[in-house]
Curated annotation (Swiss-Prot):
Protein name, per record: DNA-directed RNA polymerase subunit omega
Cellular component GO terms, alphabetical: DNA-directed RNA polymerase complex
Family matches, as PANTHER family: DNA-DIRECTED RNA POLYMERASE SUBUNIT OMEGA
Gene: rpoZ
BP-aspect Gene Ontology terms: DNA-templated transcription
Compositionally biased spans, kind Basic and acidic residues: 103-120
Chain residue ranges for the region called Disordered: 90-136
Matches recorded under SMART domains: RNA_pol_Rpb6
Keywords: DNA-directed RNA polymerase, Nucleotidyltransferase, Transcription, Transferase
Record EC number: 2.7.7.6
Known partners and oligomeric status: The RNAP catalytic core consists of 2 alpha, 1 beta, 1 beta' and 1 omega subunit. When a sigma factor is associated with the core the holoenzyme is formed, which can initiate transcription.
Pfam families: RNA_pol_Rpb6
GO molecular function terms attached to this record: DNA binding; DNA-directed RNA polymerase activity
Catalytically driven reaction(s): RNA(n) + a ribonucleoside 5'-triphosphate = RNA(n+1) + diphosphate
Length: 136
């Protein structure tokens, strides 16, 4: 039974290896609960999948797209590119908007706090008070 089915399918999908990939993918879909497009006739899922491909009740191109989609781990989404903002000129207005130079950044120092100081500070924090606005 399956041999005749494979010979019917070779006319639809010329590459035997691709046929095996598509039929096995369709058989897995059938096992997962996909609806049948042909009568089962007590056949197993791989034979039903081959019969569906041979009878062209499901197209090989659709199966190929589904197979590719199922194997993708990352689906690339086309997003519009961010617009580039032109650089500001060296006008007085631009100087007022421009950030300070990096030499000023070198003078900034951060306070160091030990873990004990941090824990004491967290213990001294009061819990937030509940307000009547929460129900609104």
């Amino acid at each position: 039974m399956a041999r005749v089915t494979v010979e019917d399918c070779i006319e639809k999908v010329e590459n035997r290896f691709e046929l095996v990939l598509l039929a096995s993918h369709r058989a897995r879909l059938l096992a997962a609960g996909a609806p049948l497009t042909v009568e089962r006739d007590r056949d197993k899922n791989p034979v039903v999948a081959l019969r569906e491909i041979g009878d062209e009740t499901i197209t090989a191109e659709d199966l190929k797209e589904q197979l590719i989609h199922s194997m993708q781990k990352y689906v690339e989404v086309d997003e519009p590119e961010a617009e580039t903002v032109p650089l500001l000129s060296s006008s007085p207005a631009a100087a007022a908007v421009a950030p300070q130079s990096s030499s000023d950044d070198k003078d900034v120092q951060f306070d160091r706090m030990s873990e004990e100081d941090l824990l004491r500070g967290l213990e001294n924090l009061a819990p937030p008070t509940e307000t009547d606005d929460e129900g609104e």
